[in-house]
Each structure stands twice: as structure tokens, then as C-alpha cells.
């Protein structure tokens, strides 16, 4: 008689479940013993029944095997974590390197380099992106120029306002009179006249006779010759 295949699901009947547990438990304990003897393996088996009863088997000592397991897992989990971190860092670095290479290739294509390997679709896509970039650049340039023009206009208006204020101030101020300079020689005109008169000497003596004769050489003789005898 061929036995049917047992379905791997929870047995709903409590009695059948308990019978199956007892059979499988004994078989599991037997297999653990055979494994420890035939393969010289350290085996520890702990089983709790549905009612909470403990069944165990250990080739050496259950407690020692548990401590060995804890030590092993602690060391290997730490090493495994470090190794996983290293592998993750390497994977991230490789991914970043690939992205950087792709960006460099795309940059060269935008600059018009290495276009021999591009298809028509790729070239068209590059053309569209370049046109969009140019539109964005021109828009930004126009905006900056408009801002500069607005600043210059504000500066012009301010200068005009300052100029008008200066003009109003100049209109309200009285005109400046020319400074009066008095020459030293004009302060005392009488002194100038006296000085001039002092410097002018006029001889009023009368000379009778021929011109060119000196009074000192023969003034008396000439007077005697010129006068008629009585």
C-alpha cells in the first residue's frame, strides 16, 4: 500500500498532532545521535513540545555547545558586518565611478567631442538639450542686463535730483562781492604830492649873454662887454 504525501501544514486534530510529534521527535533524536557518532560532530538538539515539555540531546554538553555557538556567532557576525560594510563601500565606489564616467562622456558629447559613436536619435536628443540650454542662458543674460539697466536708471535719477538740489541752493545764496584792494601809495595822496614837489628843483636865476658860456668862467667879463658905456 502506497502512503500518501503528507502536506506541510499544521495538523488541526490535537490527537493526531501529538502522535505525529512523538514519532518525528524520536526520529529526529535518532538522526542527531547517528550524526554525532558517524561524523564525529558536536551536536546539540533542543525540542519543546506543544505543551511546553523539553526534549534534548547533546553529544558533549548542551551548555558548552550553546556557549560555543554564541562565541562563534559573535565573532563571525562582527567580521561579517565589517566585510559587508567593505563590500558595500566598494559597490558604492564602483557605482559612483560609473556615474562619473557617464557624466564625463555626456559632457564631451555636449562639447561636440566623441560624436562618432552617437546615433541619429542621440544626436537629435543632444541638439534639443543644447537648444533648451541656450534658451535658458539667453533668458538669464537678458534678465541680468535688465537689472543693470534699471540700476543705471536709478543712479541717473538720483544724480539729476542731486543736481537740482545744488541748483536751488546756488539760487538762494547771495552773490559774492569783489574784494576791495587799496594800494599803499593811494592811502595818503598828500604824501605823494609832497614827495613829488620835494624831488622837483627849478632854477630861477637870469643869465644874460650868449648861450653856451658858463657863468663861472666869464660871467663878469661878459656883463662888462655887453653893457654900453655911458
Swiss-Prot record:
GO molecular function terms noted in the UniProt entry: DNA-binding transcription factor activity, RNA polymerase II-specific; protein dimerization activity; RNA polymerase II cis-regulatory region sequence-specific DNA binding
A GO cellular component entry from the record = nucleus
Q: What does this protein do?
A: Probable transcription factor active in flowering time control. May control internode elongation and promote floral transition phase. May act upstream of the floral regulators MADS1, MADS14, MADS15 and MADS18 in the floral induction pathway.
Where is the MADS-box domain positioned along the sequence?
1-61
> Can you name this protein?
MADS-box transcription factor 50
Q: Which PROSITE patterns match?
A: K_BOX (PS51297), MADS_BOX_1 (PS00350), MADS_BOX_2 (PS50066)
- Pfam families recorded: K-box, SRF-TF
Tissue spec. comment: Expressed in mature leaves and at low levels in roots and young panicles.
Gene knockout outcome: Late-flowering phenotype and elongated internodes.
Disulfide linkages recorded for this protein, renumbered to the chain, are none
Amino acid at each position: 500500500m502506497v502512503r500518501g504525501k503528507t502536506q506541510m501544514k499544521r495538523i488541526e486534530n490535537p490527537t493526531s498532532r501529538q502522535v505525529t510529534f512523538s514519532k518525528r521527535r524520536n526520529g529526529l533524536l535518532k538522526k542527531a545521535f547517528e550524526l554525532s557518532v558517524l561524523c564525529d560532530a558536536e551536536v546539540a538538539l533542543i525540542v519543546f513540545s506543544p505543551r511546553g515539555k523539553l526534549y534534548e540531546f547533546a553529544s558533549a554538553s548542551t551548555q558548552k555547545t550553546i556557549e560555543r555557538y554564541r562565541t562563534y556567532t559573535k565573532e563571525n557576525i562582527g567580521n561579517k558586518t565589517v566585510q559587508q560594510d567593505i563590500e558595500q563601500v566598494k559597490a558604492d565606489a564602483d557605482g559612483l565611478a560609473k556615474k562619473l564616467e557617464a557624466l564625463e562622456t555626456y559632457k564631451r558629447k555636449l562639447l561636440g567631442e566623441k560624436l562618432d559613436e552617437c546615433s541619429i536619435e542621440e544626436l537629435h536628443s543632444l541638439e534639443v538639450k543644447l537648444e533648451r540650454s541656450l534658451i535658458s542662458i539667453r533668458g538669464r543674460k537678458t534678465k541680468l542686463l535688465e537689472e543693470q539697466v534699471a540700476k543705471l536708471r536709478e543712479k541717473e535719477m538720483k544724480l539729476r535730483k542731486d543736481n537740482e538740489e545744488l541748483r536751488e541752493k546756488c539760487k538762494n545764496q547771495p552773490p559774492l562781492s569783489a574784494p576791495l584792494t587799496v594800494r599803499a601809495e593811494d592811502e595818503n595822496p598828500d604824501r605823494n604830492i609832497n614827495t613829488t614837489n620835494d624831488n622837483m628843483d627849478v632854477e630861477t636865476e637870469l643869465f644874460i649873454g650868449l648861450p653856451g658860456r658858463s657863468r663861472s668862467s666869464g660871467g663878469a667879463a661878459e656883463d662888462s662887454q655887453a653893457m654900453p658905456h655911458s
